[in-house]
Amino acid sequence: MRFRNVVLAAPTTVLLFFFALHASIKSQRPQQAPRPFREYPGVEYQSFPIPPDAGRQSEWVFARFMYRGIRYSNWTIDYPRSDRHFAEAVRRLTRVDARSVEQPVAAEDGDDIYNWPWLYGVEVGHWDLTDLEAAKLRDYLLRGGFFMCDDFHGTWEWEIFTASMKRVFPERPIVDIPDNDPIFHAVYDLDDRYQVPGAQYLYTGRTYERDGYEARWRGIYDDKGRLMVAICHNMDLGDSWEHADEPEYPEKYSALGFRIGVNYLVYAMTH
């Protein structure tokens, strides 16, 4: 797994692409200022310390996609600990100036979604998009936005995920991402990828959940070959970020999880 120093050596180019992407997404939309930072009670964390620099202006923000779950508030899984650990990793591993706190984003909240070029959705095997959410997400992605889906496992959750995703893109196929795709080489050369398990690995010893025995790297492309949706099926990158500071969670999984996330972020900023 080799490291490409393009982000460390030439951050200006990356940021110029980012600002152009941000402008493209917001173009021809009614102007709406980004929502201020806001917190929500999570499934796992009801209260979490806010970093002292949370209000500082930054170049990139971890935007977490809010949705209605079929059972409970699945969108808050790992939130906000996972988000803040990943933002800190972005600061350390690149010259991208990441905000220290995340931003929950709802597709139905006016045009706010267009302010956030990179979205992360967790446990999407439990979501149930409305027609309005699906239409807004489709428009956002076709305008240049990027959506990373993570932490869902097995056949049953895949079927739930695709039922809503087909409302977003009824005619666009979900395909396996080839090994030579730029997303696997944006910063790190990720030729040696393996299944990244959730915290359940610590007491089961299994890297898989349900019948999700094999990690699948899938996506949806636009007409120009840009990856719009990156689908991390049968893996839990969010847990690898969340538990990165716990000695019990194997370092090799957190290391790969951060590298995948950084690649996906830099790819989104440069495509």
For the regions a protein language model found, what residue spans apply to each?
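N-terminal secretory signal peptides that target proteins for export/translocation
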Residues: 1-4
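Core RNA-modification/binding signature centered on pseudouridine synthases
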Residues: 7-8, 28
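Bacterial N-terminal signal peptides
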Residues: 9-22
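Residues embedded in well-ordered secondary-structure elements
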Residues: 16-19, 51, 219, 253
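Aromatic-Pro/Gly-enriched surface loop or interdomain linker
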Residues: 26-118, 122-125, 228, 236-239, ...
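An acidic, glycine-rich "communication" segment
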Residues: 32-42, 46, 70, 157-238, ...
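Helical hinge/lid and interdomain linker segments adjacent to catalytic or ligand-binding clefts
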Residues: 76-162, 167, 196-205, 232
